[in-house]
Swiss-Prot record:
This is Ribosome-recycling factor. One of its GO terms (molecular function) is ribosomal large subunit binding. Keywords: Cytoplasm, Protein biosynthesis. It comes from Thermosipho africanus (strain TCF52B). Belongs to the RRF family. It comes from the Bacteria. Coiled coil: none annotated. NCBIfam families: frr. One of its GO terms (cellular component) is cytoplasm. CDD domains: RRF (cd00520). One of its GO terms (biological process) is translational termination. The gene is frr. The keyword Iron does not apply. SUPFAM superfamilies: Ribosome recycling factor, RRF (SSF55194).
């Protein structure tokens, strides 16, 4: 049976990695993705509402997103919200749908996105290492109080380090995958 401290540490590390993965999905890469619009909200009858809750968002083959609102009166609100966002895209409204065309990113833009990806992943690594630090501190406290032996402390510290290495490696893989996605497009 796994020690409860290790289970807790693993759960926290896993959640940190999942949070970073979600954040990376929202990062612009030059490739159209409905996830890019998740944070953009429009005023829907006085309530700030994400675009994906008032419209269908589809990716087309020609590097664009098609946003088809369920109510046509939302077209201009969607268009304005996208223009006001930090995506740097110019939506076009044809009266039925809002179209977002993704231009080919420049090398400079790609490098900027890779740098941003690296920063996000580094925050995840820091979070994982902080969890390790907290657990090791807790283990030392337990040894000091006589709750566990020094041998158990060393064994658990080694297992915590193995968990840390595992999740740092996962974060590195996330970075490599995102970097490849950014640079290949």
């Amino acid at each position: 049976m796994k020690d409860p401290i290790l289970k807790e540490a693993e759960l926290r590390m896993k959640k940190s990695v999942e949070a970073i993965d979600e954040e990376l999905k929202k990062l612009r890469t030059g490739r159209p993705s409905p996830a890019l619009l998740e944070e953009i909200k429009i005023d829907y009858y006085g309530v700030p509402t994400p675009i994906n809750q008032v419209a269908t968002i589809n990716v087309t083959e020609e590097r664009s997103l098609i946003i088809k609102p369920w109510e046509k009166n939302l077209l201009s609100a969607i268009e304005k919200a996208i223009q006001a966002s930090d995506l740097g895209l110019n939506p076009t409204n044809d009266g039925n749908v809002v179209r977002l065309v993704f231009p080919s990113p420049t090398t400079e833009q790609r490098q900027k996105w890779v740098k941003k990806t690296k920063e996000i992943v580094e925050h995840g690594k820091i979070a994982v290492r902080n969890i390790r630090r907290d657990v090791i501190k807790e283990l030392k406290e337990m040894t000091k109080n006589g709750e566990i032996s020094e041998d158990d402390e060393k064994r658990l510290e080694k297992e915590v380090q193995n968990l840390t290495d595992k999740y740092i490696e996962e974060l590195d893989k996330l970075f490599e995958r995102k970097e490849k996605e950014i640079m290949e497009f």
